C-alpha cells in the first residue's frame, strides 16, 4: 500500500458502459483527483464466455467521451491468472486453504439441505479437515479458503458505516475452480493488492463481496483498502433501473445528444450532495467531492432533470465548440443523418456558427439542435412539413411574392437591414409583423418553428433567401 490515493474502476466487459458504472467511474475519478492520486482502469474479463472485445471498446470509448481519463495502462484481469493461482497455492501451502473434492451432486445436495433448513451457509465444509489421501481420483478439486468459523468479519465502510457479518454464516469460498481458473473473488483481491489500490469505491451490490474479500486479505496478511459502497441508481418509479425506464448505456446518451459535461454534472448529484448547488464545473466537483456526503439511499434517475441540465450546458457552451459537437454527434445517431453530414462544408459550418446563438437558446439536446438547424442544410425547393404547407395558402403565397420584391431591394444584407425592410413593408400594408413573419418562416425553413426570422434571413444570406422565397411565391 502506498501513501498516495489510488482508486480503480473495474468494469466487466459483458455489455455497454452502464450509466451506473459511469457514475462509479466518476466518483473514483473525482476522489483520486481531489487527493492528488491516481485512478486505474481494470477490465475484469475473467468470465471468458460473456466478455467481448466490443464491450471493452464500448467501455473505453464511454470513459473517453465522458473525459474520465485513467492513469497508466489498462489492466486486463484474465492476463494475471498465473499470479492469482500463485496466491491460491501460497494459501494452500500455509494451511489457509484446502482442496475440496466435493462432486457437483454433493454440492447440490448440500445447498438444498441448507436452504431447506434456512441456513445461508451452503457448503458444509466436508473437505475442510478430511485427509486428502481419501480423495477420489476422478474428481478435479477446487481450492477453498479456510475461512474463520467463529467471530465476526467487519467492514468500516465510508458510506454504509460499520457492517458486520457472522462468520458462521459465511462459506469457505472457492479460490480456484476445478479447471484451475481463479474465481472473481480471488482475482479482485490479488489485483487490488498488487495495483496498490487504497480506496475501493463501487456499487453497494458488491457489499456482500466485501466480507469474503476481507477474509482473503486477512489470510494473506494484506491491509484492506478503504471501502465505500455507493447506492445503486433506480428508475423514476423507485425500482431498479432497467431498459423499460429508457436508455442504460452511456453510448445511448451520447447518441441522444447529451453533452459529456452535463452527464457528468447530473451523475455526480445522484447519491452525492453539496448543499443546494446543482451546477458544478469540473473544478468545483473535484474541490467539493467527498465520500461523507454520499447517502445510503438509492438515487432516482430523473430524465427531465437531465434534459433541463443539458439545456443549461448547451446555452452556456462556446458556439465554436457546439459546432464541433454538432458534427461529432452525427457519427452516433441514426443513419438518416448521413445526408446532413455530407452537406457539412466551410459554408454551412460558417452558417451554423452564425446561427448558433439563436439555435442553442431553444435546444435541450444536440439532436434538437440538429433539428432546428435543418433549414441551413435543406435543398431547394424545400419540402414543407404539414403545418407549413397549411400556412402557405394561396393568399400567403401571394404575400411571399410581395415580400420577395421588398427584400430584393435590400442592398446590404443583414439581420438588421432585412428587419427594417420587413417592418416597413408591414407598416405600408397595414399588417402586423407576425402576419408577415409566419408565412415567411414557412417559406424559408419549411417549418412553422425556427430561430428568429431575421436571424434566419441573415444566416441564409441574400441569394439563398430570395431563391427560397421565389420557389414558394405566387404571382
UniProtKB/Swiss-Prot annotation:
One GO BP annotation of this record: glutamyl-tRNA aminoacylation
Motif ('HIGH' region): 11-21
Keyword flag Oxidoreductase: no
Reaction(s) catalysed by this chain's protein: tRNA(Glu) + L-glutamate + ATP = L-glutamyl-tRNA(Glu) + AMP + diphosphate
Single GO MF descriptor: zinc ion binding
EC number, as in UniProt: 6.1.1.17
UniProt-listed Pfam families: Anticodon_2 (PF19269), tRNA-synt_1c (PF00749)
Keyword Ligase attached: yes
Motif ('KMSKS' region): 240-244
Residues of the signal peptide: none
Keywords recorded for this protein, A-Z: Aminoacyl-tRNA synthetase, ATP-binding, Cytoplasm, Ligase, Nucleotide-binding, Protein biosynthesis
Assigned protein family: Belongs to the class-I aminoacyl-tRNA synthetase family. Glutamate--tRNA ligase type 1 subfamily.
Subunit structure as annotated in this protein's UniProt entry: Monomer.
Name by which UniProt lists this protein: Glutamate--tRNA ligase
Gene (name only): gltX
Amino acid at each position: 500500500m502506498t501513501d498516495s490515493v489510488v482508486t480503480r474502476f473495474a468494469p466487466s466487459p459483458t455489455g455497454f458502459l452502464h450509466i451506473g458504472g459511469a457514475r462509479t467511474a466518476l466518483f473514483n475519478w473525482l476522489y483520486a483527483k481531489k487527493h492528488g492520486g491516481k485512478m486505474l482502469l481494470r477490465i475484469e474479463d475473467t468470465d471468458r464466455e460473456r466478455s467481448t472485445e466490443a464491450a471493452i471498446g464500448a467501455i473505453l470509448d464511454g470513459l473517453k467521451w465522458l473525459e474520465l481519463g485513467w492513469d497508466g495502462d489498462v489492466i486486463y484481469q484474465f492476463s494475471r491468472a498465473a499470479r492469482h493461482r500463485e496466491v491460491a497455492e501460497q494459501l494452500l501451502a500455509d494451511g489457509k486453504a484446502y482442496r475440496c473434492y466435493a462432486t457437483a451432486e454433493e454440492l447440490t445436495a448440500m445447498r438444498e439441505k441448507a436452504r431447506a433448513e434456512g441456513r445461508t451457509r451452503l457448503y458444509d465444509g466436508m473437505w475442510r479437515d478430511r485427509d486428502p489421501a481419501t480423495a477420489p481420483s476422478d474428481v478435479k478439486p477446487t481450492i477453498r479458503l479456510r475461512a474463520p468459523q467463529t467471530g465476526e468479519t467487519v467492514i468500516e465502510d465510508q458510506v454504509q458505516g460499520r457492517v458486520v457479518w457472522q462468520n458462521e454464516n459465511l462459506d469457505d469460498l472457492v479460490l480456484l475452480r476445478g479447471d484451475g481458473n481463479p474465481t472473481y473473488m480471488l482475482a479482485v483481491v490479488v489485483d487490488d493488492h498488487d495495483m496498490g489500490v487504497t480506496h475501493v469505491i463501487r456499487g453497494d451490490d458488491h457489499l456482500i463481496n466485501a466480507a469474503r474479500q476481507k477474509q482473503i486479505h486477512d489470510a494473506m496478511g494484506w491491509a484492506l483498502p478503504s471501502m465505500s459502497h455507493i447506492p445503486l441508481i433506480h428508475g423514476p418509479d423507485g425500482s431498479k433501473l432497467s431498459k423499460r425506464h429508457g436508455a442504460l448505456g452511456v453510448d445511448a446518451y451520447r447518441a441522444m445528444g447529451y453533452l459529456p459535461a452535463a452527464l457528468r454534472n447530473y451523475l455526480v448529484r445522484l447519491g452525492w450532495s453539496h448543499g443546494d448547488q446543482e451546477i458544478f464545473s469540473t473544478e468545483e466537483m473535484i474541490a467539493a467531492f467527498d465520500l461523507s456526503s454520499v447517502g445510503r439511499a438509492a438515487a432516482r434517475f430523473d430524465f427531465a432533470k437531465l434534459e433541463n441540465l443539458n439545456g443549461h450546458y448547451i446555452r452556456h457552451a462556446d458556439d465554436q465548440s457546439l459546432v464541433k459537437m454538432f458534427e461529432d454527434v452525427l457519427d452516433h445517431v441514426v443513419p438518416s443523418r448521413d445526408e446532413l453530414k455530407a452537406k457539412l462544408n466551410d459554408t454551412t459550418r460558417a452558417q451554423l456558427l452564425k446561427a448558433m446563438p439563436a439555435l442553442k437558446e431553444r435546444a435541450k439536446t444536440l439532436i434538437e439542435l440538429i433539428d432546428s438547424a435543418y433549414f441551413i442544410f435543406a435543398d431547394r425547393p424545400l419540402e414543407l412539413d404539414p403545418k407549413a404547407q397549411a400556412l402557405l395558402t394561396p393568399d400567403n403565397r401571394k404575400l411571399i411574392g410581395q415580400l420577395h420584391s421588398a427584400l430584393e431591394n435590400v442592398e446590404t444584407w443583414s439581420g438588421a437591414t432585412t428587419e427594417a425592410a420587413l417592418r416597413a413593408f408591414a407598416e405600408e400594408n397595414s399588417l402586423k409583423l407576425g402576419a408577415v413573419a409566419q408565412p415567411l418562416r414557412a417559406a424559408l425553413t419549411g417549418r412553422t418553428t425556427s430561430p428568429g426570422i431575421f436571424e434566419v434571413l441573415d444566416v441564409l444570406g441574400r441569394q439563398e433567401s430570395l431563391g427560397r422565397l421565389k420557389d414558394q411565391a405566387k404571382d
